């Protein structure tokens, strides 16, 4: 029997490879082997529109557009509006968490986070 998430494809979008690669590896370990990567918001949008994905995990520090603007574009899009969107922040008191939640964020993590934090968030979303 395959893991419950083995068919779900998640896009990890972060301008820093040092952030993306460990997260992709962790997703594979948790049963999401189909993760893909983007280094900016426009690349993320292109990938999301060209290949089916069930989720996006991104940094609010994306560029062109930033993470919050990307989230808003996704929620306004008829083809992407139901995509599960998660973000990770550096500070629990970050005002961006409130803005992103109001814009339709499905879940978030605060750095540094542990494997079980990511697993709990993904389980709650799916």
At which residue positions do the language-model features occur?
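The feature encodes the CheY-like receiver
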Residues: 62-63, 93
